[in-house]
Amino acid sequence: MFVGMLILSVFGITFSLKAVERPIEVECPLGGSNAKGWVILGSYHSGVGLDGKQYGAHVQPNPPPECPDNGFLVYKENFSESELIQLRKYIFSEEYQSMWKNTAPAFYRLAKIYEYMGESITDHYYHYVIATWEYDYPPFGKKYSFYTLEAIEVLKKTIGIMRSNLLSETQFVEVHYLLAEL
């Protein structure tokens, strides 16, 4: 009896350590098939690295739903007509399509979208860090190096902006930690 309960409790713990996700589907504002992604309903985290990477059943955030026909990441619910015109130019550009077809990490592409749209780097620098997590172990040496060097440059730029604008001291320290971690 005791052994049976012990086995059930071990399996119960194992099952409870899994991330609970559900597929989501949203309309692709740039046309084509619906964008598909996953939403996290709950997960177990056993720790956090200096770079903010969580360890446990689900180790990184899910990217926004991705349009399967063009690689656009539907990063918000509604877009104005002028935003869609601007996004269409970038998403269908050779630069973006090349990134998508060469399987650049979704968070790297998302950071590039934000940059193209003129968003402040202080609002999306962390996407570059998340992109490194996709390649943070062998055999991805060259890809990890590429995305890490990109993240380092963005973090340096972010520090410069934060210093000159006297933004949040906590965020300023956080960016320094991220830079040291990479």
Predicted regions and their residues:
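Bacterial N-terminal signal peptides
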Residues: 2-12
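N-terminal cysteine/histidine-rich coordination modules
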Residues: 15-92
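Short Fe-S-cluster ligation motifs
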Residues: 59-65, 99-106
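Alpha-helix boundary/N-cap detector
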Residues: 82, 98-105, 146-149
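Amphipathic alpha-helical repeat scaffolds of TPR domains
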Residues: 88-89, 93, 101-142, 170-182
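Alpha-helical repeat scaffolds
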Residues: 106-113, 144-163
